[in-house]
């Protein structure tokens, strides 16, 4: 996968100039590691307008910039109005390739925490609608999207392209509330087989799991997608498990004869379906979804107080409940993390080592958080 993604990158970037006004590269430090990302700002962003955010995660051996071009949402974002972030994974300890840790690797890299911290950083810097944050990805990025659905409440919906769920992920999925899910997968995928492999669930089992959790009808509506491109050597079927009441929808595009590829991609790397655009279908799916309550509302932290000394060299955190447990982290406006500590009850922290400048404290308790900005003299 690494070699063909490198070839794709060279083809796509030849003679290409990125607009500095549209794409921002950034770094944050999480769990002692410096992490990088690319953030796409759509055209015609209006002052005061809050926009949705799509996390677009690369596959094994790839990176954020390659995924930005291969699984491309940028023209859609310009028209529909949403932000896109393309984060970078870390090097796999044995393979030496970029990857996402979906809970089965011994490296201990906290990718779930990184993506949540990245969301916190971006939402502090940009006008993001936190009720419309979505996660999608290719291959290993699709696995990571499922991992986020199982272990985070920050996303309104997820979509996987050529990804699946590991058996431990499915068996230990911590989610109890419905979340809209889309899976796009080729039946001739030799990297992540449609019928599963050792330690990886089949797509049928993945769909069964989410339709049960989401409380959708067990019999889907099946639509044969019009074969508009007879030269792509594959066809598509669209399976729809609709939502009713408090349930959440599940959709699946089954690419008959399709390979380990992103449908609609401008470069064919293996058998690539051109009857649909995965990016357009994913955004259609995401755009009809909104969390009923804003993510990470401050319920439970409303009465938490933060008191600074005159020169902001110390800060005292006073929760409503003296037995409250929470995590406090300090960041600068570029997202660099200076410390992260777990505290119980009223606590005072020294900020002497911080250089003069603007910072913010993020305080987490269970699944809620608050952010406080301050200036260190």
Residue ranges and their predicted role:
Residues 1-22, 295-298:
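Bacterial Sec-dependent N-terminal signal peptides
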Residues 18-53, 79, 83, 136-159, ...:
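A domain-start/cap signature at the N-terminus of enzymes
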Residues 24, 28-38, 44-134, 147, ...:
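Serine-hydrolase catalytic machinery in alpha/beta-hydrolase-like enzymes
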Residues 24-33, 337-354, 367-368:
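Glycine-centered tight-turn motifs at strand-turn-strand junctions
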Residues 183-185, 189:
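Short beta-strand/loop motif that positions the catalytic acidic residue
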Residues 290-314, 320-322:
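Residue-level detector of functionally pivotal "anchor" positions at catalytic/ligand-binding pockets or at interdomain
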Residues 316, 356-377:
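C-terminal tail/sorting-segment detector
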Residues 330-338, 359:
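Short, glycine-anchored, charge-dense loop/turn motifs used at functional sites
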């Amino acid at each position: 996968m690494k070699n063909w993604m490198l070839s794709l990158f060279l083809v796509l970037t030849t003679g290409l100039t990125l607009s500095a006004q549209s794409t921002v590269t950034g770094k944050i430090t999480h769990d002692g590691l410096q992490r990088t990302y690319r953030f796409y700002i759509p055209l015609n962003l209006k002052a005061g307008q809050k926009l949705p955010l799509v996390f677009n995660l690369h596959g094994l051996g790839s990176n954020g910039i390659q995924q930005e071009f291969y699984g491309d949402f940028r023209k859609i974002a310009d028209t529909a109005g949403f932000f896109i972030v393309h984060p970078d994974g870390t090097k796999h300890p044995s393979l030496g390739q970029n990857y996402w840790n979906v809970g089965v690797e011994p490296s201990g890299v906290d990718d779930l925490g990184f993506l949540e911290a990245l969301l916190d950083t971006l939402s502090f810097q940009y006008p993001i609608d936190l009720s419309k944050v979505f996660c999608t990805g290719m291959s290993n990025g699709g696995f990571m999207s499922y991992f986020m659905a199982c272990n985070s409440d920050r996303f309104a919906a997820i979509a996987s392209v050529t990804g699946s769920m590991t058996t431990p992920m499915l068996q230990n999925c911590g989610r109890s509330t419905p979340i809209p899910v889309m899976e796009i997968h080729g039946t001739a995928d030799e990297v992540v087989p449609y019928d599963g492999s050792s330690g990886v669930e089949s797509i049928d089992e993945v769909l069964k799991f989410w339709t049960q959790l989401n409380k959708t009808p067990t019999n889907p509506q099946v639509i044969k997608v019009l074969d508009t491109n007879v030269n792509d050597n594959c066809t598509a079927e669209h399976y729809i498990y609709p939502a009713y009441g408090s349930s959440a929808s599940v959709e699946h595009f089954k690419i008959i004869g399709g390979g380990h590829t992103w449908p609609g991609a401008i470069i064919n790397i293996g058998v690539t379906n051109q009857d649909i655009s995965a990016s357009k279908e994913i955004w259609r799916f995401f755009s009809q979804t909104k969390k009923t309550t804003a993510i990470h509302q401050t319920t439970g932290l409303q009465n938490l107080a933060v008191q600074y000394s005159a020169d902001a060299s110390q800060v005292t955190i006073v929760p409503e409940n003296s037995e409250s447990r929470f995590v406090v982290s300090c960041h600068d406006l570029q997202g660099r993390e200076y410390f992260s500590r777990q505290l119980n009850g009223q606590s005072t922290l020294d900020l002497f080592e911080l250089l003069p400048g603007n910072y913010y404290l993020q305080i987490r308790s269970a699944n809620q958080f608050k952010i406080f900005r301050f200036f260190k003299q």
